Amino acid sequence: YRILSSVQENVFFNGYLSHYAEVVNRISAKVTKVEGNSARHEATFMVTESTSGRQNEIPVWGEEYPSVFMRDELGTYDIEKKYFMPVVRDVPIFPRRDVKVGESWTAEGHEAHDMRRSFDIQEPWIVPFSAHYTYTGTVKEEGRTLHVIEGRYNIYYDSPTVKDRASLTSDLPATTMGFSHQTLYWDNHKGALSRYNEEFRIVIETVFGNTFEFQGVAQAEVSDFVAPSVEKIP
């Protein structure tokens, strides 16, 4: 399957608008193995970013990220620390029961951010959260029935690695705050998301007292979904 996602965001530094950015992520993924209730996904994320409104403007930046992960029937990821993609993981997570329209539930998830360029952090920067979901009903799109889920989570995370701030010689994220409001369109026949829309705001406060703020919208759509013939291990 393939996913095309895009982000449009304003980026602020210490309260002042730094620049506007548009990030496009072209994802190609394949399910290569099924083990019990989990499936192995092998994916390539091709990310390009264009910016405007900054003095040292970089018209287009791009990078390719490989990723391999297991995801179970409820949506939980099992992924090695070396992989930077996907950014949002364990969304959505379903309960172990049938969900009725109007019903809500909560589940843990996390975001994984690439901080190599900003802070020289060589592993994904993991930010946990607790998400609240509500199943709001169904919609018809191109003859398909999609199940609509509203997902929301707030973030407030103090980094455990920067407690001894006086000994630090380089800036690092100290506190990450923000929110994400998502509308998820789930295709029950395929057992996967069909598309989603998101509004978000993320603020990172650093050890040296700087703030980076990202606010904007995102959207993604799955295409070329093919039911593969994969190796199945009981």
Language-model segments: residues:
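Short, positively charged
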Residues: D72-I79, V162-S167
